[in-house]
Amino acid sequence: MNVQNEKSMTVRGKDRYKSGVMSYKKMGYWEPDYTPKDTDVICLFRVTPQDGVDPIEASAAVAGESSTATWTVVWTDRLTAAEKYRAKCYRVDPVPGAEGQYFAYIAYDLDLFEPGSISNLTASVIGNVFGFKPLKALRLEDMRLPVAYVKTFKGPPTGIVVERERLDKFGRPLLGATVKPKLGLSGRNYGRVVYEALKGGLDFTKDDENINSQPFMHWRERFLYCMEAVNRAQAATGEIKGSYLNVTAATMEDMYERAEFAKELGSVVVMIDLVIGYTAIQSMSNWARKNDMILHLHRAGHSTYTRQRSHGVSFRVISKWMRLAGVDHIHAGTVVGKLEGDPLTTRGFYDICREEYNPTQLEHGIFFDQNWASLNKVMPVASGGIHAGQMHQLIQHLGEDVVLQFGGGTIGHPMGIQAGATANRVALEAMILARNEGRDYVSEGPEILAKAAASCTPLKQALEVWKDVTFDYASTDAPDYVPTAVPAA
């Protein structure tokens, strides 16, 4: 069927409110003639109907169940501005190359959402509707957030520009490392890793997502040893350093206590995990803003709902929500590392974090223009399976405003942690110098690294150990678009 040509079937007048069951199309949730307002929130869903279910009806059901509808007509609709508050599915397209899947464009009136609340937004657009029986699967692919709604959020407490000013580091990616092994180290040994990595040339070290307060190392002990390491490394190098102290805990009271202690010790940054939830993330963002702290977000748990192509929530949507919620850093993929990341899709994530305005770019998976209304920018973090030998590729794909985190690529160095950090710093400086000189650092990357390694034994060792190690697997989440040939002039 040609889903794009099906006309409105909305029942008008008294018949609309007769008791009984009525199709979602007839209840007014399918409005192909509707033109979205500048103030509408627009969602793009990938809808996979059950066999025999009309895709228009399935898409209208998504609109209804994520806004005002229930399974039967209710007379109390007449006590509301029902036609205004109904979400309106106004377009349904087949997904290119995916039989039985459809893109449904749904517009929501801004008054349906509480200002400045990610929890309220998500309770509607990814609430009960994802369990709706007539659907095999449902995925939220993208959203257009109107300026009127964006302005109700505070956004990142620090932002890229101010973070660079505080660190006094410009013109290059920042370097970091996640402490490994992620679990099992004592506080003293943990602090030793932090010191050696920072002294060797890194800007940051980082707790991993699941290091909180365990029997082998309580949080207070870790914070004390880490900040001793940071202070010693700063004194030794003359550079501002930091360590992402994970304050994730069982309750908000515990998290505030840990964050306050980190501040008292002089930390410039604290860390939280995505799994703490949207309300907790916004609460910690408010705390970070009041206390002039950088807020780092580890996206722990995201792949449980972002990785599958047909069901869940795209990470581009999570990126938008987190920019609104107010985090300064977010892990956003590496392209060449060990974790999921199609190159074009990942560039879309980075654009969402870093740009003031996102134009529609279907090849990057971005379906809508997005104006960020001067909201601070988020620093993306690339972490997971990267090493010095990939430096030219990382800069090519990810650009300059990014934190490159070499965990195993620092701590696994055969000459030790400090040497691993030095290898990464020298590789980065060599590549940035080549870029600034106007050289083709991408094609000349291996040559540039080899020349730098000739006078840097740690880098030479790193290149010998990891060579051209990469994780070359097909992505499960590539953009859905069909390139169109440009006619000859």
Curated annotation (Swiss-Prot):
Please list the residues that make up the active site. Answer: 180 (proton acceptor), 298 (proton acceptor)
**Enzyme type, top EC level:** lyase
Q: Which CDD domains match?
A: RuBisCO_large_I
N6-carboxylysine PTM positions read: 206
Organism superkingdom = Bacteria
GO MF annotations for this entry?
Answer: magnesium ion binding; monooxygenase activity; ribulose-bisphosphate carboxylase activity
How is the co-factor bound, per the entry? Binds 1 Mg(2+) ion per subunit.
Pfam families per UniProt: RuBisCO_large, RuBisCO_large_N
Cofactor(s) this protein cannot do without: Mg(2+)
Magnesium found in the keyword field: yes
Further comment found in the protein's record: The basic functional RuBisCO is composed of a large chain homodimer in a 'head-to-tail' conformation. In form I RuBisCO this homodimer is arranged in a barrel-like tetramer with the small subunits forming a tetrameric 'cap' on each end of the 'barrel'.
Subunit architecture: Heterohexadecamer of 8 large chains and 8 small chains.
Protein name in the entry? Ribulose bisphosphate carboxylase large chain 2
Q: What is the originating organism of this protein? A: Nitrobacter winogradskyi (strain ATCC 25391 / DSM 10237 / CIP 104748 / NCIMB 11846 / Nb-255)
Q: Which gene encodes it?
A: cbbL2
